[in-house]
Regions:
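Juxtamembrane regions of bacterial inner-membrane/periplasmic proteins
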Residues: 2-15, 20-267
């Protein structure tokens, strides 16, 4: 219970022989009643609001993570109708009022040329079948190159790229990297290597409005994905790091490197 407010007054000195008794006089009572009552300052509301905001943000992030994890489970059987990258490109075209046509067709992995599968693995993630979502050797080498100021390689695996394409788009931030890192093991555990490769090849951006192996092969070479040969597969794989700036016919040097990697890997 709150304590009653105390009322203080000045001391009344009573000398011997005076007629005044040792009691409060009427004037002192009036003075005390008319004195302003001082209340203690109220604690800042910031101290109460801030923890609630932090808890609310944390709960929202956890909820979004759970939704993404459930979507990964569903992708074990359901082909993705779209991705964050697809929606991002649609939004950018709408904002800038530029024409946009999406080419996207999901096909089974069995209908994608083995040469194209091997070329993409050789170009993007040579240890795809050895790691569990993170290529620590490539991460270490990339970090070393960062320290030396000569970064020439990326360290993202196919699984990491798939998670980014599905849920986060092309933006970069520490928050996105952290969320991506927690979802990669889920994707590896739930989907498995074959399904990860299948979804990646079918949703990855291969040019302006071009998504997936089938659309890329028909857009650049006029042939279905099942009929692509080694050389054209290497050229298609060569544009993946920068699909909006590169063209297959200009990637002879890099595609030759990819072909050598394929031979070294036994393909």
């Amino acid at each position: 219970m709150p304590q009653p407010t105390r009322v203080y007054r000045a001391r009344k000195i009573v000398h011997p022989g005076t007629e005044e008794r040792a009691r409060l006089s009427f004037s002192y009572v009036t003075e005390a009643l008319n004195a302003p009552i001082q209340t203690p300052p109220r604690p800042s509301s910031f101290r109460f609001v801030m923890p609630r905001i932090v808890i609310g943000v944390f709960l929202v992030l956890i909820s979004l993570w759970l939704i993404a994890a459930l979507m990964l489970i569903g992708l074990r059987w359901i082909d993705p109708p779209t991705t964050a990258v697809h929606m991002q490109r649609h939004l950018q075209a709408w904002i800038h009022s530029t024409p946009y046509r999406e080419r996207y067709k999901f096909i089974p992995l069995s209908q994608i040329s083995p040469d194209l599968q091997h070329a993409v693995i050789a170009a993007e993630d040579a240890r795809f079948y050895q790691h569990h979502g993170f290529d620590w050797h490539e991460i270490q080498m990339a970090a070393q190159e960062d320290l030396e100021g000569a970064r020439t390689r990326g360290a993202s695996t196919i699984t990491q790229q798939l998670v980014k394409n599905l849920f986060f788009g092309t933006g970069r931030s520490f928050l996105r990297k952290g969320a991506e890192a927690t979802l990669v093991p889920v994707a590896e555990f739930v989907l498995g290597k074959r399904r990860i490769l299948e979804i990646y090849l079918d949703v990855v951006e291969w040019g302006p409005g071009v998504y997936g192996a089938e659309s890329a092969c028909r857009y650049y070479d006029g042939t279905p994905a099942r009929n692509v040969g080694r050389e054209q597969a290497a050229r298609l794989a060569a544009i993946l790091p920068a699909p909006l700036r590169r063209r297959p016919e200009r990637m002879d040097s890099y595609s030759a490197i990819i072909l050598r990697r394929m031979v070294q890997m036994g393909w």
